[in-house]
Amino acid sequence: MALLDYFLRKKEKQVTTASKAKERLQIIVAHERNSRNKQPDYLPQLTEDILKVLRKYIKVSDESFSINLDKKDGDLNVLELNIELHDEQTAD
């Protein structure tokens, strides 16, 4: 009976160890995803400043303007700016 208890306890211990390892791995993966997708604090203000400058010269709606900051190749940041321009919207 003691021999059987020894093997059963060992199997139960493996299950709890595996679940703890899985939980820790999920925490690490969530942390890595968060750090990769985190936008800098200055991005909303930068967006507003760029819109102010653009609106001095052309009519730009919020829907026709988008700005994204992506990480490429580790520590290279790429600022992507998309603006829909229409000929009839140019200001004189």
Curated annotation (Swiss-Prot):
InterPro entries on file: MinE (IPR005527), MinE_sf (IPR036707)
Pfam family, one: MinE
Gene coding for it: minE
Keyword set includes NADP: no
Family under the similarity heading: Belongs to the MinE family.
Function: Prevents the cell division inhibition by proteins MinC and MinD at internal division sites while permitting inhibition at polar sites. This ensures cell division at the proper site by restricting the formation of a division septum at the midpoint of the long axis of the cell.
GO biological process: cell division; regulation of division septum assembly
Intrachain S-S bonds: none
Name listed for the protein in its UniProt record: Cell division topological specificity factor
Phylogenetic placement of the source organism: Bacteria, Pseudomonadati, Pseudomonadota, Gammaproteobacteria, Alteromonadales
SUPFAM superfamilies: Cell division protein MinE topological specificity domain (SSF55229)
Gene3D superfamilies for the chain: Cell division topological specificity factor MinE
Domain of life of the organism encoding this protein: Bacteria
Entry keyword set: Cell cycle, Cell division
